[in-house]
Design a protein with these regions (language model features):
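C-terminal alpha-helix plus adjacent terminal tail
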Residues: 89-94, 114, 121, 125-197
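An acidic, glycine-rich surface segment that forms the CoA-thioester-binding/catalytic face
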Residues: 1-28, 188-197
Length: 197
């Protein structure tokens, strides 16, 4: 009999995926089964070269990934690769997981802490409302394209009127963001903008 309620694990993963905070998984070893499904619910995943291994081992046990793996993996890596991960139940090394899109990036063991912390710190300096609504807009990509575009336009218009947006856009222009030289270092200029909300 089909249960229309989400399981507790599904509910937890959806709360992580849709919460208004940024979630980052730093995977420094093996992640499989429910752990892989939980990590796939995060906004970003980072691994260690030669150490991170991803696996969905359920099918050989006579079951299937029941914690959101059959739904999240195709969205991350595509249908064919998701089939290979789920049906093949073989270890996916860090390099392949990055190339396929399960991991955002991979780093050496001596680099990962600093790299992930730097990204988290960078994001934490940006206006909170912009981070939250940008995440909500990306999550709206699960909607049909017309609805997703409408949601993006609505959220963009909401943010455009905020004090933080007005302040940071003005600061960006004052720092030369509209110049040819500024365009060549837009990442650096963006990092100089702080919270105004």
């Amino acid at each position: 009999e089909r249960n229309l309620e989400l399981s507790d694990f599904h509910t937890m993963c959806e709360r992580v995926r849709t919460m208004n905070k940024v979630t980052i998984a730093q995977i420094e070893g093996r992640v499989g089964g429910g752990g892989s499904e939980f990590a796939a619910s995060m906004d970003m995943r980072f691994g260690v070269i030669g150490k991170t291994i991803v696996n969905q081992m359920e099918v050989p046990l006579g079951i299937l990934p029941g914690g959101s793996g059959t739904q999240r993996l195709p969205r991350l890596v595509g249908r064919g690769r998701a089939m290979e991960i789920v049906l093949g139940a073989d270890d996916l090394d860090a390099e392949t997981a990055e190339r396929w899109g399960y991991l955002n990036r991979i780093y050496g063991a001596e680099q990962i802490d600093a790299k992930v912390a730097a990204l988290a710190e960078r994001i934490s300096r940006f206006p909170v409302a912009a981070v939250r609504l940008a995440k909500a807009s990306v999550n709206a990509s699960d909607l049909p394209i017309q609805q997703g575009l409408q949601e993006e336009a609505y959220l963009f218009a909401r943010l455009l009127r905020t004090e933080a947006a007005q302040h940071n856009m003005s600061q960006f222009l004052q720092n030369g963001g509209q110049t040819r030289e500024g365009e060549l270092r837009v990442g650096e200029l963006s990092a100089q903008l702080g919270k105004a909300d």
